[in-house]
């Protein structure tokens, strides 16, 4: 069954990366053959499925050694979300959006949720020591939380980067590592976005400052509870 799933997921990219990049530019500028550009982006998205399955399996083996009850999920970013990301303003609300779709590292992504701080750090360390043909770089939002208060560890895997040639060489897959409380925080942000019509996650600089401050403070208290930071009694009773 697993082998059948792998074979079904082997969707080969039918276009060059340059064609994909130009399709993204066409969509962002809303100039040119939009329908054809969307078709190209859709196929590029689908081609991420096989490398996503490979990376998910790699990460899952490490997670199971840390906690057999760890939760893992994978997804391909929805096409409307990719298009929105190409067209919307940047997160700082100032610089123009010039992102190339071929540089989006989260079209294919998986998330691992572990119990606590220790398990998170052990899993990250285990992945660091992993011998693999895939290169990875780390974005540590534990040491450097986002301005919104988001915390977690992201690992960007460039698939088969150490191989001379491979059909899926160079595809990026993002892996998010979170504790249960960090995941609860992130899920709550998404729920507020949905129910209140906010954009705390995607465009925080255009969102209600009160919500932003609320979630930033909540993140600080959660980080203190889990041992990532220390808040003095004075800071807790601001």
Predicted ranges, named:
Residues 2-47, 168-238:
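An acidic, glycine-/histidine-flanked metal-binding catalytic module
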Residues 34-94:
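Surface-exposed, low-hydrophobicity interaction/linker segments
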Residues 55, 120-126:
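Hydrophobic side chains in well-ordered alpha-helices
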Residues 93-105:
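Short, flexible, solvent-exposed loop/turn segments with mixed acidic/basic and small polar residues
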Residues 104-106, 147-151, 167-171:
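A short, structural micro-pattern
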Residues 112:
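Residue(s) in the substrate-gating loop at a strand-loop-helix junction
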Residues 115-119:
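Helix N-cap motif at beta-to-alpha junctions
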Residues 127, 132-164:
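Short Gly/Thr-rich strand-loop-strand
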